[in-house]
Amino acid sequence: MDDTELARLQQVVQADPADIEARLALLHGLVRAKRWHEAEQLGIPLLEVEDAPATVHACMGIVYGKQGRWDEAVQQCRQAITLYPDDALALFNLGTLLAHQDDTKAALECLEKAVAHEPEWAETHYTLGTVLLRQERYQEAIRAFDRAIESHATYPEAYFNRGNAHALRGLEADGSLDYYELDCAINAYKTAIQQRPGYAAALYNLGMVYQRMRSSEGVRVWDQYVEATQDLPDEEIWRLRAQEYKHDLQDRLR
């Protein structure tokens, strides 16, 4: 919905504040436009309407979440799901919010339901994968990232986290390396970088894999990372570490 359509809906709502359908359409438009304050101002009165539709609660869950008002966001998403249990978007948003609050079990339950309702929705698979990754359920996380990639081939974040899952599987408890898993991690990181040139986190983690493998490729990757982040102040500490790792690797390769 473009600005012209939003302006038209605002005029309709101003002319007839009792037109609930127009107010709902405007609320959707403001949420899509990421105009959170305006959406909040419109949505609060709609919540007070008797038998407010599930879509109002779902939209306000998104708005409150974007504003960092986590408890209110969770409450709104739960109300939306109470009214419409099969709302995949509300389930996805609730799962994301619960993951943010470290309620992993409930988050996984919501995300798995969302996936069941919308199996082609890449972002849901990806978010499910990130929660599983934090739970160290690496193989399940990899499957979730694979499904995200199947639904949306250009998804550098999914390849990046797929690489992370393989990299963590590649480090055995006794300190030994599983080179098959590390090779899978390398390929995933490379694809992420190919899809997003200069992807700092993927370059850094790729460098770390080569560092552990004592591969000369690590020297080249560390140089790439330093070059890609030279104008990024937030990467300064990591850039210094990368330079240290590079020198250490060069010493080991001599």
What are these regions, as identified by a protein language model?
Residues 20-21, 53-55, 88-89, 122-123, ...:
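Helix-start (N-cap) detector for alpha-helical repeat units in TPR-like alpha-solenoids
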Residues 1-10, 33-45, 67-79, 101-113, ...:
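Structural signature of tandem alpha-helical TPR/SEL1-like repeats
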Residues 50-123:
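A generic tandem-repeat structural signature
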Residues 15, 49, 83, 117, ...:
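Structural marker of alpha-solenoid helical repeat scaffolds
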Residues 1-7, 212, 219-254:
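Terminal, low-structured helical/coil segments at or just beyond the last alpha-helical repeat
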